[in-house]
């Protein structure tokens, strides 16, 4: 019996890439691959790339330069290391990667991960392999399911892709070009995935998609189901005590989703709802198809459905043509909404997007100054949100052992890390924690009660 081959995946960017990395591991497991954290030991290295962040392509080529050294070192010891580039940079620039980086054996787009074994074999025979077409077949129908041991090893929280692609075509974004048109998975397939996860110890599931609340998958009744209806069905699965979803578009928030937040204790009251700018002029230039007041009204509808709901968001500063007045409108929006956290970035052009051809570029120094201002405001809001937990009792789902002896780490409904000193038998349980203090972004406290209900019982009671 031949020894297992070692696989190292380095993922960049969004939660979808984290999920995709796991599915690539599942696809390669039948071929004898096992994961390793040490890139130098790997027989196959996959760079799972993201095209959203600044200088995404340059980072890929820089990493490939380092991998060339590791590959040469492996060859000196009589071992062949294959290198693959996956993800959105691979999709957008596949042929260029093949041309510029001879060290790469395989380039594969996000829609073709189920073909990885065949592509690796092709590269062995012919030197290199490239697949970045959008296939007709649904990759989710042919990707192998994770083994029970693999699910348990990944912990009590899991991502499940329910929707992929985007039809919005924001002028700054490459996602419609790298992930394709919106596609929703059938309800039955998602339910089967979540049941399998729950049966193997998963207690929290985050439903993910580039535009997740545009979900419209085929239901068992022959009709398209909304995200809200899907969440209701998943909340019925024994063992699942927490449900989340990300990332949403303001225009696709509907009554079904709001009602789910009103009715379902398992649906966490924390929503990531990107807005990008508080200026109507910039929102129009971004092709967001909503105004700042439209966004405010969506926030108000969420708050009417759930008094405990909180929000995070995404912001871009320095979009072409952004004036001080536009930026002030963004600050005003942030101040009015009040976020538990947010991500903010300086604009950087993505080749092939309409915004890349806009000529009114904001000077880099101005972008730096605006980003600092915005981040200061967001940090103040996040700090205030976290400090509000001191002295209160919050529900925490415990996930793993902490760094200190006897420490167990979990997360609140709002994804705040929470640390207590307790036995590891509490892992997988939702318990009340009395918060005593903060350490950076983490809550420190004590278990509020010696009695607890296991996650399975909480799911059954709807608590």
From Swiss-Prot:
Required co-factors: [4Fe-4S] cluster
Domain MTTase N-terminal: 5-125
Keywords: 4Fe-4S, Cytoplasm, Iron, Iron-sulfur, Metal-binding, S-adenosyl-L-methionine, Transferase, tRNA processing
Disulfide cysteine pairs (residue numbers): none
Cross-referenced InterPro entries: Elp3/MiaA/NifB-like_rSAM (IPR006638), Methylthiotransferase (IPR005839), Methylthiotransferase_CS (IPR020612), Methylthiotransferase_N (IPR013848), Methylthiotransferase_N_sf (IPR038135), MiaB_methiolase (IPR006463), rSAM (IPR007197), rSAM_horseshoe (IPR023404)
Known role: Catalyzes the methylthiolation of N6-(dimethylallyl)adenosine (i(6)A), leading to the formation of 2-methylthio-N6-(dimethylallyl)adenosine (ms(2)i(6)A) at position 37 in tRNAs that read codons beginning with uridine.
The protein's name in its UniProt record: tRNA-2-methylthio-N(6)-dimethylallyladenosine synthase
Organism: Rhodopseudomonas palustris (strain TIE-1)
